[in-house]
Amino acid sequence: MPEADIKPRSRDVTDGLEKAAARGMLRAVGMVDEDFAKAQIGVASSWNEITPCNLSLDRLAKSVKEGVFAAGGYPLEFGTISVSDGISMGHEGMHFSLVSREVIADSVETVMQAERLDGSVLLAGCDKSLPGMLMAAARLDLASVFLYAGSILPGVAKLSDGSEREVTIIDAFEAVGACSRGLMSRADVDAIERAICPGEGACGGMYTANTMASAAEALGMSLPGSAAPPATDRRRDGFARQSGQAVIELLRQGITARDIMTREAFENAIAVVMAFGGSTNAVLHLLAIAHEANVELTLDDFSRIGSKVPHLADVKPFGRHVMSHVDHIGGVPVVMKTLLDAGLLHGDCLTVTGRTVAENLEAIAPPDPDGKVLRALINPIHATGGITILRGSLAPEGAVVKTAGLDTDVFEGTARVFDGERAALDALEDGTITHGDVVVIRYEGPKGGPGMREMLAITGAIKGAGLGKDVLLLTDGRFSGGTTGFCVGHIAPEAVDAGPIAFVRDGDRIRLDVAGRTLDVLTDPPEFAARQQNFTPPAPRYKTGVLAKYVKLVGSAAIGAVCG
């Protein structure tokens, strides 16, 4: 088979008399005559100093470039943004989190297209930067490799009773709720705050970043075994160099992102997310990435796969372990091999190694599940996957609940309705949210929020207040990957689009049936329908800027909250 053209695009800026000015610019950044015959590789990084999630990317980008050079290419690094959900949580800043996913994808596309780069290595560490980079790869359909920054190690807090406790960032959110109810001292909150982030890396549990890193590996877009090692682990530098080499080999073989991101590959990613009991945000992001790859993927696919794939991983937020423990027992390949052997994974999917999933796993030969961090298929934590898709009179287009960790299937209670998260937090702090309540937080969807904010402040506070198993929370917004408890998000249609959630009133009875996959408001249908007459949505919160544009473009959470 003849080798593909390794400069399918960069000839536009390097070849011919009329490109003298472009070559002159490239000489100024270090290129010499012989470099103009090399493939030009964009090394896109979301490195910044705002959050620990991305701190390793500066180091890793250097190793990626070494790998590109070693393989005969020429790397050109550029940056994009990243928003820290941990810092932006619980205030106005969270409106800007999900839109950052689109900004990242758009900015990478813009640079890659404008500069005619031949391929890319995409580096990310924060929750929205991972899917944003993968969306860009799918949209561009060039030779691309994704590289994760790696997760943070757990911290150890020394509490006032003399005990020591392993903690992650989620413990801080829950400590706030406990302290506000008098269940924890301010000194212990301070001890937890100081311990939760002992260094660089993304939040350590199976929260959104680690879930999406695992999904990227299962999707075939990152090197096998690269998702689990911590950010500080020097194996990451090796994966970075190999990623730089891999993108050149993909160019030589003529393999592009959509050759890898097939429907079967997305089914593999969903299966791994289900086995891990990963973040509900993976539903939103995988739908969006599939949209960019021109792959038809729906909420029904998550239901279908989740009904077959058991929940195997005892990981936070519901379990005991973090990503570094997953790494200790062999990483994501252990999960993938377990699923492959059971016929729950497509082994013939192509990956960035140029080989198939099955071939990669045969070469790695991962160990069997250890039985603690990851259980065997014959002894799952739950018989079905850790995420369930719901439908019903309150969510005709769908809703999402994380079932990993739930110990009951049915919750029926009385609605307490709040237009926005802040009002719900105030009610919790006042002690007026009690056992049996169904807390409904609306006008927090993609358009209505805008930005579909994560509700970690309220869910963490509810758990910290000791109500995690006694209160059901519903929203057209999202939840953090660190959320625990009875929490249903992504309710669609959202309130601003006249979805049923807009017409729920205090005192309505609401029923969640996880096994039946239903979410219903039990109000008499004619009465409920009468409430919908003459509906007028609230005026847009933002009249100018990025969110004003976002509201005009963004679609339903049921299709990934994509813009166009």
From Swiss-Prot:
Keywords recorded for this protein, A-Z: 2Fe-2S, Amino-acid biosynthesis, Branched-chain amino acid biosynthesis, Iron, Iron-sulfur, Lyase, Magnesium, Metal-binding
Active site (record annotation): S480
Cofactor: [2Fe-2S] cluster; Mg(2+)
A single BP term in Gene Ontology: L-valine biosynthetic process
Modified positions (N6-carboxylysine) in chain numbering: K128
InterPro entries, alphabetized: DHAD_IlvD/Edd, Dihydro-acid_dehy_C, DihydroxyA_deHydtase, DiOHA_6PGluconate_deHydtase_CS, ILV_EDD_C, ILV_EDD_N, IlvD/EDD_N
Enzymatic reactions: (2R)-2,3-dihydroxy-3-methylbutanoate = 3-methyl-2-oxobutanoate + H2O; (2R,3R)-2,3-dihydroxy-3-methylpentanoate = (S)-3-methyl-2-oxopentanoate + H2O
Keyword Lyase included in the entry's annotation: yes
Assembly and interaction partners: Homodimer.
The name this protein goes by in its record: Dihydroxy-acid dehydratase
Organism per entry: Mycobacterium ulcerans (strain Agy99)
Upper classification of the organism: Bacteria, Bacillati, Actinomycetota, Actinomycetes, Mycobacteriales
